[in-house]
Amino acid sequence: MMDGFAQDWPTLTHTDNGLAMDQLSGVVGGGDLPGDVGFEPQTRARSNTWPCPRPENFVEPPDELDSTKASNQQLAAGDSQQAIQNANAAKKNSSRRNAWGNLSYADLITHAIGSATDKRLTLSQIYEWMVQNVPYFKDKGDSNSSAGWKNSIRHNLSLHNRFMRVQNEGTGKSSWWMLNPEAKPGKSVRRRAASMETSRYEKRRGRAKKRVEALRQAGVVGLNDATPSPSSSVSEGLDHFPESPLHSGGGFQLSPDFRQRASSNASSCGRLSPIRAQDLEPQDLWGFPVDYQNTTMTQAHAQALEELTGSMADELTLCNQQQQQQQQQQQQQQQQQQQQGFSAASGLPSQPPPPPYQPPQLQQQQQQQPSYSLNGPAPGGYQTLQPQSQSQCLLHRSLNCSCLHNARDGLSPNSVTTTMSPAYPNSEPSSDSLNTYSNVVLDGSSDLLVQQQQQQQLQQQQVKVEFEGQCLEVLNNEAQPIDEFNLENFPVGNLECNVEELLQQEMSYDGLLDINIPLANVSTNAPLVNLVNNSTTLSSSSSNLSGSTTTLSSSSLSAAVQLNQLQAQLQQQQQQQQQHLQQQQQHHQHQQQLLLNNNNNNNNNNSSNSSLDLATQTAATNLNAARVQYSQPSVVTSPPSWVH
């Protein structure tokens, strides 16, 4: 047997050249090799690293020594090597086994710090202790082979709460590492989680575990009525959030599709399914069951919901309370008068009173309730009382609008006999009974018309005052834009006025007018007077608007004149500059022409001089040639001998 392996080396069957070992038997001693004939080659373990494989018949003892379970206790100063050997002997059959023994890096660091006299060591001192006291690290102290285990020691120091870092007193020195006496025994929490609120997280997790245990003991099953798989986490299927105010009552569960980070799909690939867990209905999306009659809500849950609804109602802004009260009072008076007129005239069976008045903003919420009107209900429950439509606009009632005639048209014989019963769902008389007392209803409708005319007169009087005040505010307030008051939206009618006279009059006052409109006393024949007054007020407002437009036009004209003057001045300056530039260009061209003429004259003079020089030179050469010719000595020939 060899050290470090669980079985013998396999025997060789062939040599490096491919020859079988049995063929060499004749060469080695002339016989067969002992122990090599008839045996198959044995397999070798693939991994020869730590930890070594255990034997097949090994049984781990059930109980371990208590002294080996808690490794955070401080060791007394003494022989550290003996302490390590004792720990190795105690943990001989433990599940954690390393190349140097059965102790982890954290245990070794704990022994190293505990063996120091002052119970503190620096990082370099911990390295030295490892090399000196652990046999495995004795030959791994150099820089090449110590990078791995030194990195592991640094990680264990920073990630375990049992070790505490203390600043060194000296400058430029590494910090001290000490044992934390307040550390909890057992597996410590990683220090990386210290950035989170660990205490709050631990409390919340503990409460959630207790609640889950209580639900399991009571036999509460998850939302899907299926037993969870063993690999599923505790929080999956029972998602509780105790910190939420809605869930403080307990037992409020979310959808089973919601999962926390711990129960991700990456760790539960075997439980994935392409089919959705549950087809959620709109009621299930909010966590409430379908059967609303059997729902049970705790008191805390109900209080939380009431607080939420109260806060939401406070934030909503409705219309002005004073306007609501006035409209409600007017509506109640009209309803009482209508009821008195119908009951006194016809003697119909007692009907329930109509519903109270509601502002226009809340009519959409009451669409499913039956409405009461004189013109009959509209399909779908959208018909509202006629005075509500009149109260929606203040300006229409002051003019000759069709809104005022709706109530009168609704009291025709046909409408009374055909549309009274559907408005009141509690009483539905037959057509014969309606025909019998339809005449009586028509007799009593005359009183109703008189009362309604009086009410309309009062309303028109109030609306006239409001309308005039609005017109004055729009005209006199300079901060408001003129677009808010648009006469095109109102059916004014045929108004005749002399625009030129108005313009001349307002131009004389420079557009500064102080408008004071006296309120006329309204008699019983109010509709015609109101129409005349309204037309006059509208004409005055239109004249004021035209005056403002004329002032604007005059100011715009003055500004236009100034702009024209500035433009003319600019044009004159530009023309002067252009003339000056043209003069400069002409002067420059004249100078260039003079220079060119001078150059031409110089060239002509040079050419004449050169021709004279050439002529003189040729004459001189001719003279020289003549001189040479005549300066040669003449040859004197002697006379002949016969001349004496």
UniProtKB/Swiss-Prot annotation:
Compositional bias segments (type: Polar residues): 226-235, 261-270, 412-421
GO terms of biological process kind: cell differentiation; glucose homeostasis; negative regulation of cell growth; negative regulation of cell population proliferation; negative regulation of insulin receptor signaling pathway; regulation of DNA-templated transcription; regulation of lipid metabolic process
Keyword Transcription: yes
Residues carrying Phosphothreonine: T49
Subcellular localization: Cytoplasm; Nucleus
Residues of the DNA-binding region: 100-206
Region described as Disordered: 39-75, 187-210, 222-276, 329-386, 412-435, 578-612
InterPro entries in the record: Fork_head_dom, TF_fork_head_CS_2, WH-like_DNA-bd_sf, WH_DNA-bd_sf
Gene Ontology terms: cellular component: cytoplasm; nucleus
The protein, known as: Forkhead box protein O
Organism of provenance: Drosophila pseudoobscura pseudoobscura
Gene name tied to this protein: foxo
